[in-house]
């Protein structure tokens, strides 16, 4: 496949205010100066995603956009020892996709956000360029609590046209 593109999907569920704070649970800190959504963005970057798409409602999108931003640097391409380190960096754009109003509060769950996000990404990418059409999707849930660098050794397998699934103790999501 000549133009393989890996798109990262991060679903942010609207009804995730279970801790009682004014902000979504995806903005809860999981480490010093690191929120759950930022951890998920970094996981997508370590996995080799060329674009990252955050699927969230319009009401929480500005807060998440303010914290996360509109791009992240590919951590593999951060080379501080180059003569011009800023020239060798590879930015990864972050896009925000709102859930359609007819689906809000009716079909509002993580599974639907992933499916709706993949469909929206495909529709948008087809209209923009054939080089942006994803060959595969990498889904990162913001409520996973593990080091995002754990996917780095599998970057080549994740970024290939062949299907890939992480496992823990010999079990995958399929089990």
Give each language-model segment a name.
Residues 1-28, 34, 38-39, 45-49:
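N-terminal nucleotide-binding beta1-loop-alpha1 segment
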Residues 51-57:
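Short internal beta-strands
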Residues 9-11, 55, 140:
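Short hydrophobic segments within beta-strands
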Residues 4-8, 21, 28-34, 61-96:
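Short acidic, glycine/proline-enriched helix-loop-strand junctions
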Residues 25-26, 70-71, 154-158:
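Glycine-rich, phosphate-binding/catalytic loops in enzymes
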Residues 12-15, 58, 143:
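Residue-level signal for short, function-critical loop segments
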Residues 3-5, 49-51, 134-135, 160-161:
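A general structural motif
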Residues 63-65, 84-175:
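Conserved beta-loop-beta/alpha segment of the NTase-like Rossmann-fold superfamily
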């Amino acid at each position: 496949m000549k133009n393989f593109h890996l798109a990262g999907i991060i679903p942010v569920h609207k009804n995730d205010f279970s801790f009682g704070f004014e902000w979504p649970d995806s903005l809860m800190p999981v480490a010093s100066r690191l929120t759950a959504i930022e951890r998920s963005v970094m996981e997508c970057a370590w996995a080799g995603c060329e674009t990252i798409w955050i699927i969230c409602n319009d009401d929480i999108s500005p807060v998440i956009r303010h914290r996360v931003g509109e791009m992240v640097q590919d951590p593999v391409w951060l080379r501080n020892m180059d003569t011009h380190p800023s020239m060798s960096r590879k930015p990864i754009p972050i896009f925000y996709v709102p859930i359609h109003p007819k689906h809000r509060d009716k079909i509002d769950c993580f599974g639907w956000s992933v499916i709706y996000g993949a469909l929206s990404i495909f529709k948008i990418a087809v209209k923009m360029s054939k080089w942006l059409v994803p060959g595969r999707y990498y889904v990162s849930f913001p409520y996973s609590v593990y080091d995002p660098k754990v996917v780095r050794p599998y970057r080549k397998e994740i970024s290939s046209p062949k299907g890939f699934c992480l496992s823990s103790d010999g079990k995958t999501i399929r089990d």
